[in-house]
């Protein structure tokens, strides 16, 4: 196993996991003629919140 090295993140980048539901909906998004609508049915595994399953 190789030794660990310290990596410095650039300014403005925060490591970590963001809550998914904060990132997938953008209410001020303006649609374009080239946008494509796609729909998928997702069934979460037991214990997984529906918004995290997608």
From Swiss-Prot:
Keywords: Acetylation, Calvin cycle, Carbon dioxide fixation, Chloroplast, Lyase, Methylation, Monooxygenase, Oxidoreductase, Photorespiration, Photosynthesis, Plastid
Propiece residue ranges: 1-2
Pfam families named in the record: RuBisCO_large_N
Residues the record lists as N-acetylproline modifications: 3
Catalytic activity: 2 (2R)-3-phosphoglycerate + 2 H(+) = D-ribulose 1,5-bisphosphate + CO2 + H2O; D-ribulose 1,5-bisphosphate + O2 = 2-phosphoglycolate + (2R)-3-phosphoglycerate + 2 H(+)
Keyword Lyase recorded: yes
GO BP annotation list: photorespiration; reductive pentose-phosphate cycle
Cell location: Plastid, Chloroplast
Any one Gene Ontology molecular-function term assigned to this protein's record: monooxygenase activity
Sites of N6,N6,N6-trimethyllysine modification: 14
Main location class: plastid
E.C. code: 4.1.1.39
A GO CC annotation given for this chain: chloroplast
InterPro entries (UniProt xref): RuBisCO, RuBisCO_lsu_fd_N, RuBisCO_lsu_N_sf
Ligase among keywords: no
Organism superkingdom: Eukaryota
Family: Belongs to the RuBisCO large chain family. Type I subfamily.
Subunit record text: Heterohexadecamer of 8 large chains and 8 small chains.
Functional summary from the UniProt entry: RuBisCO catalyzes two reactions: the carboxylation of D-ribulose 1,5-bisphosphate, the primary event in carbon dioxide fixation, as well as the oxidative fragmentation of the pentose substrate in the photorespiration process. Both reactions occur simultaneously and in competition at the same active site.
Leftover remarks: The basic functional RuBisCO is composed of a large chain homodimer in a 'head-to-tail' conformation. In form I RuBisCO this homodimer is arranged in a barrel-like tetramer with the small subunits forming a tetrameric 'cap' on each end of the 'barrel'.
Protein name (record): Ribulose bisphosphate carboxylase large chain
Gene: rbcL
């Amino acid at each position: 196993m190789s030794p660990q090295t310290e990596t410095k993140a650039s300014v403005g980048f925060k490591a970590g996991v963001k809550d998914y539901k904060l990132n997938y909906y953008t209410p001020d998004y303006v649609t374009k003629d080239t946008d494509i609508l796609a729909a998928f049915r997702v069934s979460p595994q037991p214990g997984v919140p529906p918004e995290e399953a997608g």
